A protein has these predicted regions:
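Catalytic P-loop NTP-binding/switch module of NTPases
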Residues: 413-444
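Structured functional modules or segments
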Residues: 432-508
Length: 508
């Protein structure tokens, strides 16, 4: 379907470098006879370190041999955290070019600030392609600067043939775009060598900071980085690419939020709640990590039933997947590959309309008084024109944090009440758990809590009494002692802050 839609090059990778899991995708690309299978090795560790015993040159060469045997057209090195030093790039690329007659494509992130040197070393060793970003969007968690690379190779044997002036002329546009997306910045003001310790992928580093802020942990980010490094070791140093990087990040955030030392968790994981993504990883949901299973696996999975990770195509989608209608096939693929996200997307459209027609600035920041925009409801239809909406005035918040907003919709004045999430409310705050009371079960961090226990239930310490979901992370909340559920802090799924009371357990 993607090839039919115009995709020419498919970068295929597995989060744990398992070629057997990449083969179906490689074979599907080969069957098109028109597209390119670029198969990537996720890079981790430091192959120049004499103490490196997992991600060695021999490891990557054996992996590359499996990739070539599977039918790859292009070999890619996917250095998601920017860990590959120049000497390592030269050594690895040289070895790949000596053994395999395939183009080599190098991808990295510039978190530490030295990856232009890595690209120069890779190119001189025979790399054919590298990934860059326009200068205003380059550096730190992004890729090295395109302008810098073009200038570095100008008038040399590896001259790119790209006009530096043409590249520079595009930069003001991307500077303006970056300002619109400023709230999603990583928060890293410049390069950081800490990446060589924590190994957080560039694509995850900004998301992790956003997650930390949402969980109320934003001021403890350096501790989160330290815990990420510790969790990486605990889980056996897996290659960290989506979704394996999420597993490490989820556990690091969870331990920081719950105030649990990584060493204590590693010694007795059954004492603590474990995020669902971590349980799935330990159950083999993502495959087998390159270094084998970590020591805590058996203890963490004790009393949990084995899970069959085979996914069957729902019968109701089989016909749609074989449909001649392009749109029907696409919807079926969305439902099959991303069922939760598809449902959320449809709910968003039912609630807010077709928001992808709004300008980025309007979508992220809203209208200013006197500003007008067009809004679509339902699918875009030439027979049903959009609504013209102008923001006229915004009132002061009331005691519940509600503001009256005056709009003009298609020429008619429409007042409405809107909750201001940033306004202070005089409504009583949620009850806090008493840390000195072992019967008080608290939310470990900010999120939406759903209490699964009922008043009167007999529970043992460690039994799950609720679940919490926040920023794509799900985890259980367990009883803190043996006893009876005496009181629930709320009856419906509720947004809470870290430390809010969830349930009260009376001791037997």
């Amino acid at each position: 379907e993607a090839a039919t839609s115009g995709i020419d090059i498919f970068r295929i990778f597995d989060a744990l470098n398992d070629v057997s899991q990449m083969r179906p995708a490689i074979e599907a690309v080969l069957e098109t006879n028109t597209t390119v299978a670029e198969v990537a090795m996720a890079y981790s560790g430091n192959l120049m370190d004499p103490n490196e015993d997992l991600y060695t040159l021999d490891y990557y060469l054996r992996l590359a041999e499996q990739i070539v045997d599977a039918g790859a057209h292009v070999l890619a090195i996917k250095d998601m955290a920017g860990l590959m030093r120049p000497a390592a790039a030269a050594k690895l690329v040289s070895a790949l070019r000596e053994r395999f007659d395939l183009p080599v494509h190098v991808h990295t992130h510039d978190t530490a600030g030295g990856q232009l040197a890595t690209y120069l070393a890779a190119a001189n060793a025979g790399a054919d392609v590298v990934d860059v970003a326009s200068a205003p969007l380059a550096g730190t968690t992004s890729q090295p600067s395109m302008s810098a690379l073009v200038a570095a190779f100008a008038n040399t044997e590896r001259d790119t043939g790209i006009s530096l002036q043409a590249v520079s002329d595009m930069e003001p546009y991307w500077e303006a775009v970056r300002q619109v997306y400023a709230p999603f910045e990583s928060g890293i003001p410049g390069p950081t060598g800490r990446v060589y310790k924590h190994e957080i992928p560039g694509g995850q580093l900004s998301n992790l900071r956003t997650q930390a802020n949402a969980l109320g942990l934003g001021d403890r980010f350096e501790l989160i980085e330290d815990y990420y490094a510790a969790v990486n070791e605990i889980l056996g140093r897996p290659t960290k690419v989506t979704p394996s990087s999420k597993v490490v990040g989820d556990l690091a955030l969870h331990l920081v939020g719950a105030g649990v030392d990584p060493k204590d968790f590693a010694e007795n994981p059954r004492k603590y709640d474990i995020p669902e993504s971590v349980i799935g990883f330990l159950q083999g949901e993502l495959g087998t990590p390159p270094g084998g299973w970590p020591l805590l696996r058996d203890a963490a999975l004790a009393d949990r039933s084995p899970v069959d990770h085979t996914v069957e195509v729902p019968a109701e989608l089989e016909g749609d997947l074989a449909s001649d209608d392009h749109d029907v096939r696409r919807v079926a693929l969305d439902k099959l590959l991303f069922p939760k996200q598809y449902a959320e997307f449809q709910e968003h459209r039912r609630t807010y309309g077709v928001t992808d027609q709004l300008s980025d600035r309007t979508f992220f920041y809203g209208l200013v008084e006197g500003e007008e925009t067009m809004i679509w409801y339902g699918e875009i239809d030439e027979q049903r024109p959009p609504l013209s909406v102008r923001l006229d005035a915004i009132g002061e918040p009331d005691e519940k944090g509600m503001r009256q907003v005056i709009l003009t919709v298609n020429g008619q004045v429409r007042p409405m009440l809107v909750r201001d999430e940033h306004a202070e409310s005089t409504v009583a705050e949620a009850e806090k758990a008493d840390a000195s009371n072992p019967g008080h079960v608290a939310a470990p961090f900010a999120g939406v809590v759903n209490i699964t226990a009922k008043v009167g239930d007999e529970v043992k310490a460690g039994d799950q009494v609720a679940t919490i979901e926040a920023m794509k992370m799900e985890a259980g909340i367990s009883a803190t002692q043996d006893g009876t559920i005496e009181r629930l802090a709320f009856s419906q799924p509720t947004k809470v802050e870290g430390g809010d009371l969830v349930v009260v357990i009376s001791e037997k």
